[in-house]
Amino acid sequence: MASRENEIIRPKANFHPSVWGDQFLVYEEPEDQVEVEKMVEGLKEEVRKEIVVALDNPSKHTDLLVLINEVQRLGIAYYFEEEIERALKHIYDTYGDHWKGGSAPLWFRLLRKQGYYVSCDIFNQYKDNTGSFKESLTNDVHGMLELYEAAYMRVHDEVILDDAPVFTKTHLAKMLKDSLGYNPTLSKYIQDSLERPIRKRLPRVDALHYIPFYEQQVSHNKSLLKLSKLGFNLLQSMHKKELSELFKWWKHFDVEKNIPYMRNRFVENYFWALGAYFEPQYSRARIFLTKVFAFATMLDDTYDAYGVYKELEIFTQAVERWSLTCLDALPEYMKLIYKELLDLYEEMDDTMAKEGAPYHVKYAKEAMKEFIGSYMTEARWKHEGYVPTTEEHKAVAFISSGYKMLTIASFVGMGDIASEDSFKWALSNPPLIKASCSICRMMDDVVGHKEEKERVGGHVASSVDSYMKQHNVTEDHVYDLFNTLVEDAWKDLNRESLICKEIPMVLKMRLINLTCFIDTLYKYEDTFTNVGPELIDCIKSHLVHAMSV
């Protein structure tokens, strides 16, 4: 048997080991935790009163929008979800599409983000008689930034907003160049905005960028600033505790010994789940999603970077049966993966059943089976040397991107807000999930194309390969096309987040946040597979370095 095993030619990916070691294994609670929690409660009341006062006074409705924007960007909106919803609903009910206050782009962005489908016609006032944006707009840097950010909430056929990114980027880049010498704070802010608009940013990452900028503003609200810093540190402590508990679970796998071929990215898996929801009330859901992310990585590398065709067939059949009676039929290295996968879902199923919501895990399990089945289809293509058509690839890649399965997993443990109808909706391949999966698949395939082509043992044909072969074009042509299609998919995502009534906005935000994380990981290169300084610094900012108060 040993000689036969040695004869097996396996793919070889040579992934680098984890960069974190056991850094997050031990958690120590801050000594001043209770005192900080009391301070936070007092500051929350101050801010809550400010929101109520501004809401009750129509002349202060523009100030109200500014305050809500600051609360959101400082990363403390989760303290005031009810107040923000009440305020924005009042704004929408009062003005409809005919906003009378200032900061029209801010009004547009905040209401669309909240799910109110306000018209983009308000931006007609920004155009001159020739249909071009007024040059006078370029004299107001903050107004240009607001217009730039609003444009990324657009949907298809909103021509005025399609023109806005080019106009604003051009002039903001010039402002950036001109401001370098005298306003480094503003320069950094513009640079960050041009790198990634708010719509594509993870809220917690945005807060890390915005807090230092906000602190430099002379007019900043001291209560807001202090609350944002204390709140950040409180949550960081909670997240570190979660990661410590999760790390103990992960150590049980002994990856270096039992699954040495996989990318050991457990800290990055947790950070990914943190991107979906960082708020304290979703701790249980976040812990479960982290474990699902870990299995998704494990399975991806098993199917793509180690397993041979016959082994993968056996494993896929075992997953379809979902029974420990299949364990003996599996190759030795797959037994641990299979058993732990079933145990994870069974444990969560028991927990949810006690709460009267057994359907949570039932649908998550179906999504996992479908996900693994799509990997098997791709393994078959690779085994047969088959390059599928673009249409064939798209049908399978929608599932193999993992984002449908992960979206459904992200609902598990969120409580009553995730109804059985929500799970049925997600499993039915709705347009909102299709848009997210398209963004994930295309961005991943573009950055991974060249690297994976060099892998020993080959790699399944990606969507880039399929399009190149079918249309006889270069890879650079496909990269440019896919980047355009990603922007189109964002328009689909924006529209569906506005018109989809089957699930509440709080569930839609899980999907939107997961999509934002793709932009964080795969904008220029695959920073999940090849963890570099930028991602390391980002994770340290979230999970290592407390914020100075």
Swiss-Prot record:
Binds 3 Mg(2+) or Mn(2+) ions per subunit. Transmembrane segments: none annotated. Pathway: Secondary metabolite biosynthesis; terpenoid biosynthesis. Mg(2+) 1 binds at D300, D304. GO terms for molecular function: germacrene-D synthase activity; magnesium ion binding. A motif (DDXXD motif) lies at residues 300-304. The Asp-Asp-Xaa-Xaa-Asp/Glu (DDXXD/E) motif is important for the catalytic activity, presumably through binding to Mg(2+). Belongs to the terpene synthase family. Tpsa subfamily. This is (-)-germacrene D synthase. It comes from Matricaria chamomilla var. recutita.
